[in-house]
């Protein structure tokens, strides 16, 4: 089997972990990793709109984080079955403490990875340093507990096949809700307010039903984003590009 792992640098702080995992392979697997940070052409060719993508034998696309059990199945010649992550989302907006995400408090924001230690977090911070951004987004916390967050990157440096303009920001990640409460509306609105000081527009890629990479689609429509059309359709997702005037 041929395994190709595509990733946008360290935009997902777990990318380094996944790269190490895919390269711990047996002779039955041929593994290559591809950093898309400056390779916009490859991202467009492979239709990558997630911070990482695993492709098996040049055909089978997998979007979820790589796990040991996933790799074990591939080593046995078994194609894993992947299902979209579509949790029930509460729509009651909850607001605790909202603050900018910076290098100083990123230890809180990285709780979204579900890891106690995150070796790739410094890689992500360096990506923002490289484009002169001190603020990554906004975090929603209650004490030292992460509730949600919203992050962005200048669209000019996003490798996905989207419009790249200096007056446009790209919403990279919006996270945090449960069945009862919506924890991500408040940080998203704070982020939009901050972005409006520099940018005229915000773009985001969202799935119709899943919350990965962002979503679901109705969430952004409720927040005033306009549906600009479908970017990708397959058995896992139906991704839309959305835009909003800031």
Please give the residue ranges for each predicted region.
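Conserved active-site alpha-helix within GNAT-family acetyltransferase domains
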Residues: 209-229
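A short, internal acetyl-CoA/4′-phosphopantetheine-binding micro-motif in the GNAT/acyltransferase core
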Residues: 172-183, 208-209
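Local sequence-structure signature of Cys/Sec-based thiol-disulfide redox active-site neighborhoods
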Residues: 1-26
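A conserved beta-strand-loop-helix scaffold within acyl/acetyltransferase catalytic domains
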Residues: 120-168
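Conserved GNAT acetyl-CoA-binding A-motif
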Residues: 195-211
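Non-catalytic, surface beta->alpha helical segment in thiol-disulfide oxidoreductase systems
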Residues: 57-85
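Conserved acetyl-CoA-binding loop-helix of GNAT-fold acetyltransferases
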Residues: 180-197
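Conserved catalytic-core motifs of GNAT/GCN5-like acyltransferases
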Residues: 60-62, 224-240
């Amino acid at each position: 089997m041929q395994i190709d792992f595509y990733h946008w640098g360290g935009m997902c702080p777990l990318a380094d972990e996944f790269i190490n995992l895919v390269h711990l392979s047996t002779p039955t697997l041929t593994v290559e990793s591809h950093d898309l940070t400056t390779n916009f052409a490859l991202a467009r060719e492979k239709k990558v709109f997630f911070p990482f993508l695993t492709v098996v034998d040049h055909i089978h696309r997998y979007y979820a984080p790589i796990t040991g059990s996933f790799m074990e199945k591939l080593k046995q010649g078994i194609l894993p079955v992947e299902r979209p992550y579509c949790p029930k989302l509460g729509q009651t907006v909850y607001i605790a403490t909202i603050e900018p995400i910076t290098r100083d408090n990123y230890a809180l924001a990285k709780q979204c990875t579900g890891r106690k230690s995150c070796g790739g977090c410094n890689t992500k911070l360096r990506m923002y340093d490289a484009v002169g951004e001190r603020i990554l987004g906004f975090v929603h916390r209650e004490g030292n507990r992460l509730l949600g967050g919203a992050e962005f990157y200048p669209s000019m440096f996003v490798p996905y096949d989207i419009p790249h303009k200096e007056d446009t920001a790209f919403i990279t990640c919006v996270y945090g809700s449960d069945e009862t409460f919506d924890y991500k509306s408040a940080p998203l609105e704070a982020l939009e307010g901050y972005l409006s000081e520099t940018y005229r527009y915000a773009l985001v890629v969202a799935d119709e039903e899943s919350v990965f990479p962002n979503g679901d689609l109705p969430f952004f429509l409720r927040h005033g984003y306009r549906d600009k059309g479908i970017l990708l359709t397959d058995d896992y997702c139906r991704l839309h590009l959305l835009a909003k005037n800031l």
